From Swiss-Prot:
It is an enzyme of class 3 (hydrolase). Coiled coil: none annotated. This is Probable transglycosylase SceD 1. Belongs to the transglycosylase family. SceD subfamily. Its main location: secreted. The keyword Disulfide bond does not apply. It is found in: Secreted. The gene is sceD1. Residues 87-97 have a biased composition (Polar residues). GO terms for molecular function: hydrolase activity, acting on glycosyl bonds. Residues 102-156 have a biased composition (Low complexity). It comes from Staphylococcus saprophyticus subsp. saprophyticus (strain ATCC 15305 / DSM 20229 / NCIMB 8711 / NCTC 7292 / S-41). Is able to cleave peptidoglycan and affects clumping and separation of bacterial cells.
Amino acid sequence: MKKTVVASTLAVGLGVTGFAAGNSADASEQGVDKAQLAQQAQSNPESLNAAPVQDGAYDINFNYNNTDYSFQSDGQYWTWSYGQGSTNAPAQETAEQPQLVEQPQQTEQASTEQPAQEAAPQTEETQQPQQEATTQTTSSSNESTSNESSSSEASEGSSVNVNSHLQAIAQRESGGDLKAVNPSSGAAGKYQFLQSTWDSVAPSEYQGVSPTEAPEAVQDAAAVKLYNTAGASQWVTA
């Protein structure tokens, strides 16, 4: 960190021309109290801004506690600075230092203000996916409801909702005939249940009797139960 204070707007120009190399002197050569000047620069800079450290022209440079200090005057205008660096740095470089220090500060201010200008678009970008997500969710929900309505319908004479795949199986197996019986396999009913399969899914009061003796709602419920637990593979040609 390098801190430079110019006590007058003309001091920079004077620092370039008036404090040329060759006039520099160490503090000890001029009988200056290094500790006192260092403390003033660190804790009481107002006093250094208000008045020069001594009368007349001077060019004082010294290092105290690993920090470089520089105090200069042409007898009318004065400057002072401190920071890490070379104690032998030409006075011309010290005088130009305020311009180098101030320029990054202007850049930092511009960089700091920029995010505030971008804040509004960021909010819009954040909200937009939420709106799209809501629309997609609603659309998906509507499609799901529509699919369920078209694929799960109650059979005629039955209040049980049977999905479209199971309805197709019933049409293929028996043509929807509740009393259909396959003489070769013994499969019976709307869904052509084998007796052992029927007994595993039918209500207790219909177990042990032919599926053809059960009403359509009971046959539908048994078929849905078998389809949901064992899958369509229970019907060989499903």
